[in-house]
Amino acid sequence: MLSDRQQMILNAIVDNYIHSAEPVGSRTISKRDDIGFSSATIRNEMSDLEELGYLEQPHTSAGRVPSTKGYRFYVDNLIQPHLLEETELGKLKQLFAERILHAEQVVEYTAQILSQLTNYTAIVLGPEIFEHRLKHIQIVPLNAEQAVAIVVTHTGRVENKLIDLPEGIGAGEIEKLVNLLNAKLTDVPLWQLRQRLYQEISGEMQRHTEQYEEILQLLNNSLTQEEERVYLRGATKIMNQPEFRDVDKVKDILELLEQHDQLMNVIGMQGDGLTVRIGQENQLDAIKQCSIITTSYSLGGKPVGMVGILGPTRMEYGKVITVLNHLAEGLSRMLTSQFEK
C-alpha cells in the first residue's frame, strides 16, 4: 500500500497531467498549494513510485506520467466527486424533459449530449441489442452461389439477409453446420453471437469440414447485426487530444470506431454497472492507449443498454463518471416512464 505522502504526490501528478498533457516534474508539484513537500522529497517519492510501477518516464522528458497501474490506483482510491456546472446540468434536464416517441431517438440524443459534455467519443448501445436473443437461424440456398440467412429471435423478430455461398459448399453440409450453430447459440443475445461463434464453434467446425474458413465466414456474415443499434458521436474528438495528433497513432482507433460489431463486443463485455478499463487493461491493441468507461441503463429495473466514453488514458475520470451516472439514471427513468408496458 502506498504511504499517505505517496498517494498525495500520485494524485497531484495525475491531476496535473490530465490537464496539461505534459510530463510532470518535481518542481511543478512542489508549487501546488496542496503539497507541502520540498522538490527533493517529491523527486525521491516520484522515483519510488516509478520503481513500483505507478509512474513512467518518457524517453524525451525528465518528468513522469502515470502508468496504467497509476491511473488504476487513482480511479479506485483517489478520485474526488465532480460537481457539474449549471449549464451542464441544464443540458441533462432538457434531454430528459422531452417527450420522445421512440426509444432509439432517446438513445441517439443521449450519445450526442454525452459527447458534448465530456468532449470525448460517446458510444451508446441501443436497447434492441440487449432485448433480442437468438431462437434459431436458417440458411436457405437460393442457387449454387447465394442463400438467404434467416435469424429469428425469442421475441418473434425475423431478420433476412442475402449472403454469398462459398464455392463447392453443399446444402447438406450447410444444414449440418447450422444445426451445430443452433445447438450452441440458442438464447444467446444477438450482440454476442459473432464473438461466441469464434470462441465456441470454430474449433468444432474445423473438425467437421475441410472448408472450415469458408463456412466460418459464411456464418459470420449471416450473424452480422445492423449498425444503427450502435450510436456513436464525436468519433474524431480523439484527434483533438495532444497524444493522438499523430495520424498513425489514431488510425487504428478510427478504424475500430467504424466496426460497430467490434464496438458492441468491446462495450458489451464491460458488464452491468459502472466499469472503467484503462490503457493496457483493454484487450484490443487499437485501444491500449485509451480508457473506456461504461455503465448500464435500464427499463423497469432490467438492464437494456450501455452508455460509454472512449478517450485517452489521460481523461477527466471524475467528470466522465459523474456525467455517465447522471445520464444512465435519467435515461433509465425516462425509458421506464415512457415505454414500460
UniProtKB/Swiss-Prot annotation:
Signal peptide: none annotated. One of its GO terms (biological process) is negative regulation of DNA-templated transcription. InterPro entries: GAF-like_dom_sf, HrcA, HrcA_C, WH-like_DNA-bd_sf, WH_DNA-bd_sf, WHTH_HrcA_DNA-bd, WHTH_transcript_rep_HrcA_IDD. GO terms for molecular function: DNA binding. It holds the Pfam family HrcA_DNA-bdg. Keywords: Repressor, Stress response, Transcription, Transcription regulation. Negative regulator of class I heat shock genes (grpE-dnaK-dnaJ and groELS operons). Prevents heat-shock induction of these operons. HAMAP family: HrcA (MF_00081). Belongs to the HrcA family. This is Heat-inducible transcription repressor HrcA. The gene is hrcA.
